[in-house]
């Protein structure tokens, strides 16, 4: 355990007692370093290990929660309005050179909190990215999409208009929602509660997936919870109840595609040829 992690872990045991006036300088410095590391992409709340499994760094989530205890609300100037919050906006001190160096686009109306990382090639339409989130290279966050606290978004992902990717700071033991590389999430879909959408998936418009949602593979009859297998094309559907008197909502895997096919075939064609 690093010294930085140790300071944060120990402080979190007494989080309810910490206030902006009684916090030690060492703790402030540790939390600031952790938030800055998240902001720059040096640290990530979740990352893959050598076995390809997602590992959650709970101490970084604790650092985010501690930052709320350390800071009072202040007035934050914005282009069109003012804000009153404990967390500054990410771009508050950016100039032209900083934006060029970072290498992403942020159109008017995009709100990003400090402590989230935006990679090169990202396009942020009017959207919201919360603290602790990570957005990978080449990803599009479309209009009114929301990337929740600590969510992990892979490379070359398209989050369509109105998509909601759930955040998770409390309960602390819950895992962040993860969207793998090269995924397409259709308009107004919601992926929440630490669900993992693996690489190369296509989620159709208006699909809602949480930990209790049945994810039904129509080819095999298998049912998944909390994980969409790589290369899945998913639409909304329903399954009959045990008594057979009614149907309940589910997500349906209608087909699988490999990376080569996904690269050659348009998204709309994949979604339209599901029969």
Curated annotation (Swiss-Prot):
Gene Ontology CC terms: cytoplasm
Top-level division of the source organism's lineage: Bacteria
Location (main, coarse): cytoplasm
Pfam families: Hexapep_2 (PF14602), THDPS_N_2 (PF14805)
Database matches in InterPro entries: DapD_Trfase_Hexpep_rpt_fam, Hexapep, Hexapep_transf_CS, THP_succinylTrfase_dom1, THP_succinylTrfase_N_sf, Trimer_LpxA-like_sf
GO molecular function, one term: nucleotidyltransferase activity
Keywords assigned by UniProt, alphabetized: Acyltransferase, Amino-acid biosynthesis, Cytoplasm, Diaminopimelate biosynthesis, Lysine biosynthesis, Repeat, Transferase
Tagged with keyword Methyltransferase: no
Subcellular location(s) of the protein: Cytoplasm
Pathway connected to this protein: Amino-acid biosynthesis; L-lysine biosynthesis via DAP pathway; LL-2,6-diaminopimelate from (S)-tetrahydrodipicolinate (succinylase route): step 1/3
EC identifiers of the protein: 2.3.1.117
UniProt-annotated binding residues for substrate: 105, 142
An individual GO BP term: lysine biosynthetic process via diaminopimelate
Reactions it catalyzes: (S)-2,3,4,5-tetrahydrodipicolinate + succinyl-CoA + H2O = (S)-2-succinylamino-6-oxoheptanedioate + CoA
NCBIfam families: dapD, PRK11830.1
HAMAP family listed in its UniProt record: DapD
Family label: Belongs to the transferase hexapeptide repeat family.
Quaternary structure, from the entry: Homotrimer.
Name listed for the protein in its UniProt record: 2,3,4,5-tetrahydropyridine-2,6-dicarboxylate N-succinyltransferase
Gene this protein is translated from: dapD
């Amino acid at each position: 355990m690093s010294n930085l992690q140790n300071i944060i872990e120990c402080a979190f045991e007494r989080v309810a007692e910490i206030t902006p006036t009684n916090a030690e300088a060492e703790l402030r410095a540790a939390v600031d370093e952790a938030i800055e590391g998240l902001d720059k992409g040096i640290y990530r709340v979740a990352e893959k290990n050598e076995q390809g499994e997602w590992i959650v760094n709970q101490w970084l989530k604790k650092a985010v929660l501690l930052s709320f205890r350390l800071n009072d609300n202040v007035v934050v100037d914005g282009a069109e309005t003012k804000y009153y919050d404990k967390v500054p906006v990410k771009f508050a001190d950016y100039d032209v050179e900083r934006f060029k160096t970072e290498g992403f686009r942020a159109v008017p109306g995009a709100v990003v909190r400090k402590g989230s990382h935006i990679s090169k090639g990202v396009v942020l339409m009017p959207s919201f990215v919360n603290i602790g989130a990570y957005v990978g290279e080449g990803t599009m966050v479309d209009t009114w999409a929301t990337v929740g606290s600590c969510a992990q978004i892979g490379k070359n992902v398209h989050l369509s208009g109105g998509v909601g990717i759930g955040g998770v700071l409390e309960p602390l033991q819950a895992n962040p929602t993860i969207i793998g590389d090269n995924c397409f999430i259709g308009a107004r879909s919601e992926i929440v509660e630490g669900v993992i959408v693996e690489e190369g998936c296509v989620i159709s418009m208006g699909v809602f997936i949480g930990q209790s949602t049945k994810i039904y593979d129509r080819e095999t009859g298998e049912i998944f919870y909390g994980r969409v297998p790589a290369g899945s094309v998913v639409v909304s559907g329903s399954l009959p109840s045990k008594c057979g008197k009614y149907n309940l909502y589910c997500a349906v895997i209608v087909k699988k595609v490999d990376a080569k096919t996904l690269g050659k075939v348009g998204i709309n064609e994949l979604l339209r040829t599901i029969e």
